[in-house]
Design a protein with these regions (language model features):
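Generic hydrophobic, amphipathic alpha-helix propensity
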Residues: 7-19, 35, 60-64, 68, ...
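Hydrophobic/aromatic residues within well-ordered alpha-helical segments
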Residues: 10, 53, 60, 64, ...
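Solvent-exposed, amphipathic alpha-helical segments
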Residues: 13, 17-25, 67-71, 102, ...
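Helix-turn-helix
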Residues: 13, 21-55, 59
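Short coil/turn segments at alpha/beta junctions that flank glycine-rich nucleotide-binding fingerprints
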Residues: 24-25, 96, 141
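Hydrophobic alpha-helical connector segments
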Residues: 59, 70-100, 150-157, 176-179
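Amphipathic alpha-helical segments used for helix-helix packing
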Residues: 94-118
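Hydrophobic/aromatic-rich alpha-helical bundle segments in the mid-to-C-terminal region
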Residues: 116-121, 125, 139-189, 193-202
Length: 202
């Protein structure tokens, strides 16, 4: 048990060091030897846990998504959970600007790196699955309009939240404005309830 805990600690230290480097220097500034030194291990130990740089990036993305998962509260109705998720993501990226910087760097890199593109796509699909599940449950319970296409709406929610993690969008009134409009459009702004309500297209 102690050895497993030590391995987990070492792996976590390496991931956090890589995460910090990307936030401070960008993806191009990520150096595995410096990551190992910052984590207090040698380069051989880093390669034991992360044989390739792509595996290290997977660890960084998982660390970032763990932060996003803290915004998913299990209490309340599905509609309440979705509204809280939207608002909590907004607060999270404002409180932890490194998170948006890291995700932005990796998103940009994914356009030129198939390995990172795969990692980011898998992350998007997992997030989409969670949001779609909340939407479907909210429709089933009568909290949202019955004609809602949960898959398409989930795609819009995830795209909006991903955009709000970017540094330029994570602060200022426009981000808040976009989030409020998204809540109203979906029907989770708390102003009304029931599957029969109508939404204006204006």
């Amino acid at each position: 048990m102690a050895e497993k805990a030590t391995q987990k600690d070492r792996r976590g230290a390496l991931v956090r060091a890589a995460y910090s480097q990307i936030a401070e220097r960008g993806f191009e500034g990520l150096r595995t030897r410096e990551v190992a030194r910052e984590a207090g291990v040698n380069i051989a130990t880093l390669h034991y846990y992360f044989p390739t740089k792509e595996k290290l990036i997977e660890g960084v993305v998982e660390h970032a998504m763990e932060r996003f998962r803290t915004t998913l509260a299990p209490h309340g109705s599905p509609a309440d959970q979705l509204r809280n998720h939207l608002r909590s993501v907004r607060r999270l990226v404002q409180d932890e600007p490194q998170l948006g910087i890291v995700m932005g760097e990796l998103t940009l890199r994914s356009a030129r790196d198939p390995g990172i593109a795969r990692i980011m796509q898998e992350t998007n699909e997992a997030w989409h699955h969670i949001v779609r599940g909340l939407l479907r449950r909210a429709v089933k319970e009568g909290n949202l309009r019955s004609e809602m296409d949960s898959d398409e709406v989930a795609a819009m929610v995830v795209a909006t939240l991903r955009n709000l993690t970017l540094p330029m969008a994570s602060s200022g009134a426009r981000g808040d404005q976009a989030l409020r409009q998204l809540e109203r459009w979906i029907g989770v702004d708390g102003s009304s309830r029931g599957s029969g309500r109508k939404h204006s297209s204006n």
